[in-house]
Amino acid sequence: MATEKPKKRSPRAWDTLNPPLSEWIRDAVATMGFDQMTPVQAATLPHFMGNKDVVVEAVTGSGKTLAFLIPLVQKLLRLSEPTKKHHVAAIIVSPTRELAAQIHTVLMKLLQFHEASAEILPHLKDDDEKRPFTTVPAIVPQLLVGGTTTTVQDLRFFLRHSPNVLISSPGRLVELMSSPHVHCPQSSFEVLVLDEADRLLDLGFKPDLQKILSHLPKQRRTGLFSASVSEAVGEIIRVGLRNPVKIEVKVKIKGGGILEDRKTPASLQMTYMVKPASQKLPALAELLRQLPVRPQRSIVFLSTCAAVDYFQHILPLILPEGFALVPLHGKHAAKVREKNFNKFLSSVSPTILLTTDLAARGLDIPQVDLVVQIDAPSDPKVFIHRSGRAGRAGRKGLAVVMLHPGREEDYVQFLEIRKTPIAPLEKPTITTSEDDAAEFAKKTRDFVLTDRGLFDKAQKAFVSWARSYGAHQATSIFRAADLDWADLGNAWGLLRMPRMPELKGWTGDKMCGLEIDWDNYAYKEKTREQQRKVALEEEKSGVKKQDKSEEFKRKRKNNEAWSAKHEKEDDRVERREKRRKRRDAEATSKMTDDEKVKQMELNDLIAEVRRQNREKAAAEAAAAKQEKDGEFKGFDD
């Protein structure tokens, strides 16, 4: 009787790791749906757990988060004793607050399976209750992001609960680490993780990153994780990794008998369609209607925040019935961003996230079926990150980028050279026409005419889009001189073209072929409409000119008395400062020793934050002064 051969164990099985994973970690990852390691986890964990620095480049949606959380957690929990009070053992730096929050969420889920850590976690939600003391190593995380808490609240949390793992965006981390009560000595600090490393090393984050590194010991484990690391190699060397292991996990597909490297998941279909600007949104609507399976989660990328603000009102005019639309961009208030992002994640009906490149990198958005880029991104590196929102973790996905006819079609070859091949979208067949474009333009303009506020949004959005287009890095492909401005006016439903440098030499119809009674074109918002009417009446009666003359005389008079007023103000400030110091002294005399220490800590942090704010304001003022010559001067009412 033939005996059955034992099943061959997968090289990506969790029990193949050496050193082996703790049993509770294996239980945790199993509940998260990871029956075995993803390729990036299988390649990274042995090295990072084996006390080596790593530089990891892997396709988006490949499980990078657990690839650094598991080694970090395992290393800290295998220490001989708990982390000392107010000492930090590990730091994870993320470029955005959303990504930092998601990493924190994954870590919290992981720690629910570790008994000592799980007992502490509920106490972290109560600011008035200190966490229980533990004699065995445990993970105590703290999330540091702007917009949800103040720096004073962050320091208070740190002093009360003594977290040993910080997950933060760069700016907020610098503020906390500037406190003399936050310690990262070589005896305690173990691991630094830079997630989305190439973005962290961009010019905008470089100063903050240097300050963070200056607080950390050189004897540490460092991991850099990103979807594209090669273009930031020079910066990575400066970070100070010690003989790092470079790990590159790419997907290889068979095409015509030839293995071809790709930077996106094989389950993702990468396509493009060539459409005039006026047909792009009708094409999007037809794509949503024609797909054989209705996408439950879709992401539509626009170039600017102002474009999102405008098209969130316009897209519902043309979307198929049953689709909800959620806007998200970086200029939303933190609470609005969080609310809209959670709304998109929790939606049970077909939903479209209308967004900018804020959602292109790092955000863990599961089960995205469709990604549409209305315009190609100005930075070619962002293209794969936008497209990679779909097709994550083996799920099938479709990504479509829309290109204008002509020179923009060279973008296809440009991407192929960068090992990101895209093919024409063949199924479903999208057959939009000039009639469809004209119908959409009329529908949009009719809608915009109902509220002058929409006209203002359209003008602002179009100007910002034109500037963004002119900032394309692939300047030989995306040239403002090649744009069909009249067609773009129809695409945006403009009532007239705005005044802007890009249209200086354009001789087309700046009124878009429309005759509009601008005097009676009203705002829906009553306050704004009242202000408009008052301004209109003043302009007609000539009061405005008189007002300007009177204002000039008044300012001149005020300037003459400025010195005297300034001296009086200095005296008032000095008196207020004396009163404040007297009150502070009285309050301090009534404090206990512990309260005095805490107050000193808060005062130190507040002083440091104020100093940094002054430096930041001065830098921004200098930058604004340099850019003043190219500033947009506005448009006609």
UniProtKB/Swiss-Prot annotation:
Chief site of localization: nucleus
Sequence motif Q motif, location on chain: 14-42
Listed Gene3D superfamilies: P-loop containing nucleotide triphosphate hydrolases (3.40.50.300)
All copies of domain Helicase C-terminal, residue ranges: 283-438
InterPro entries named in the record: CTT_SPB4 (IPR056330), DEAD/DEAH_box_helicase_dom (IPR011545), Helicase_ATP-bd (IPR014001), Helicase_C-like (IPR001650), P-loop_NTPase (IPR027417), RNA-helicase_DEAD-box_CS (IPR000629), RNA_helicase_DEAD_Q_motif (IPR014014), SPB4-like_CTE (IPR025313)
Recorded domain comment: The Q motif is unique to and characteristic of the DEAD box family of RNA helicases and controls ATP binding and hydrolysis.
Top class in the EC scheme: hydrolase
Signal peptide boundaries: none
CDD domains in the record: DEADc_DDX55, SF2_C_DEAD
Keywords: ATP-binding, Coiled coil, Helicase, Hydrolase, Nucleotide-binding, Nucleus, Ribosome biogenesis, RNA-binding, rRNA processing
Enzyme Commission number, as recorded: 3.6.4.13
Protein name, UniProt field: ATP-dependent rRNA helicase SPB4
